[in-house]
From Swiss-Prot:
Pfam families: Ribosomal_60s, Ribosomal_L10, RL10P_insert. It comes from Bos taurus (Bovine). PANTHER family: 60S ACIDIC RIBOSOMAL PROTEIN P0, LARGE RIBOSOMAL SUBUNIT PROTEIN UL10. One of its GO terms (molecular function) is structural constituent of ribosome. This is Large ribosomal subunit protein uL10. There is a cross-link at K298 (Glycyl lysine isopeptide (Lys-Gly) (interchain with G-Cter in SUMO1)). P0 forms a pentameric complex by interaction with dimers of P1 and P2. Identified in a IGF2BP1-dependent mRNP granule complex containing untranslated mRNAs. Interacts with APEX1. Interacts with FMR1. Residues 303-312 have a biased composition (Acidic residues). Disulfide bonds: none annotated. Belongs to the universal ribosomal protein uL10 family. Ubiquitinated at Lys-264 by RNF14 and RNF25 in response to ribosome collisions (ribosome stalling). Coiled coil: none annotated.
Length: 318
């Protein structure tokens, strides 16, 4: 089969991206740094039937989207985010599910000198199994060690690389010697496009529990402010009523004014001992049956003791 010329290939690519944008209401803009062809093939296979991955040159993707803005103006929101080594993952499924599938396809990778660290790298305290001749190597990196049974032992956890730092040759060599693959590479979600709206992927981590707690926190803040400024709202009125009742109750206690709910409080303040005495009286009837049941048991035990004594006497004098 003859290979299609470049003009035909471009035309087909434009048609494909436009068709995907029309057919799929949701997509991810993903970064593909350090993702090889073999890993990309594995990602496509794992997403088959659930999502479609489309990569390409940024200029071609922008041109295709700009040419389709008349039919779908919301696509213009994608343009500022098409920069760097990026692509699209189109889907009709739950976005969180597809996000989790992308994360599952990340693969561990060794540190390479000159690479930018995507995460912090910490070397744990351990016996390295390396011989004493490597001691100077650890000293050059500022790692405290000791010789234990003829091998180098790292005494405490060491933060070797910070996020965003360039990996040095010494750090890369050390991690390789310790067989540590600190990084993992895969498609990284940069933005989420959902039915014309675009937002940060962190929004996918918001659960119903998160929304509920944030809502309650907002209600508490509104109630607090409204109570301070004396402005009644649905959130503050219950607290205002309770506070008002407390003030009326305090006024009733200090004056001759009274009402039914205040009578019990006044009676308690007038004679607290009456309430204290009422508690043992209420507990006494419950304790009485236990005492009566214990008494017959004691009598039965005494009778059994007398019978055993009599038996002992007959046995001795027979």
């Amino acid at each position: 089969m003859p290979r299609e010329d470049r003009a035909t290939w471009k035309s087909n690519y434009f048609l494909k991206i436009i068709q995907l944008l029309d057919d799929y209401p949701k997509c991810f803009i993903v970064g593909a740094d350090n993702v090889g062809s073999k890993q990309m093939q594995q990602i496509r296979m794992s997403l088959r039937g659930k999502a479609v991955v489309l990569m390409g040159k940024n200029t071609m993707m922008r041109k295709a989207i700009r040419g389709h803005l008349e039919n779908n103006p919301a696509l213009e929101k994608l343009l500022p985010h098409i920069r760097g080594n990026v692509g699209f993952v189109f889907t009709k499924e739950d976005l969180t599910e597809i996000r989790d599938m992308l994360l599952a396809n990340k693969v561990p990778a060794a540190a390479r000198a000159g690479a930018i660290a995507p995460c912090e790298v910490t070397v744990p305290a351990q016996n390295t199994g390396l011989g004493p001749e490597k001691t100077s190597f650890f000293q050059a990196l500022g790692i405290t060690t000791k010789i234990s049974r003829g091998t180098i032992e790292i005494l405490s956890d060491v933060q070797l690389i910070k996020t965003g730092d360039k990996v040095g040759a010494s750090e890369a060599t050390l991690l390789n010697m310790l067989n540590i693959s600190p990084f993992s590479f895969g498609l990284v979600i940069q933005q989420v496009f959902d039915n014309g709206s675009i937002y940060n992927p962190e929004v996918l981590d918001i659960t119903e529990e998160t929304l509920h707690s944030r809502f309650l926190e907002g209600v508490r803040n509104v109630a607090s402010v409204c109570l301070q400024i004396g402005y009644p709202t649905v959130a503050s009125v219950p607290h205002s009523i309770i506070n008002g009742y407390k003030r009326v109750l305090a006024l009733s206690v200090e004056t001759d004014y009274t009402f039914p709910l205040a009578e019990k409080v006044k009676a308690f303040l007038a004679d607290p001992s009456a309430f204290v005495a009422a508690a043992p009286v209420a507990a006494a009837p419950a304790a009485a049956p236990a005492a009566t049941t214990a008494a017959p048991a004691k009598v039965e035990a005494k009778e059994e003791s007398e019978e055993s004594d009599e038996d002992m006497g007959f046995g001795l004098f027979d």
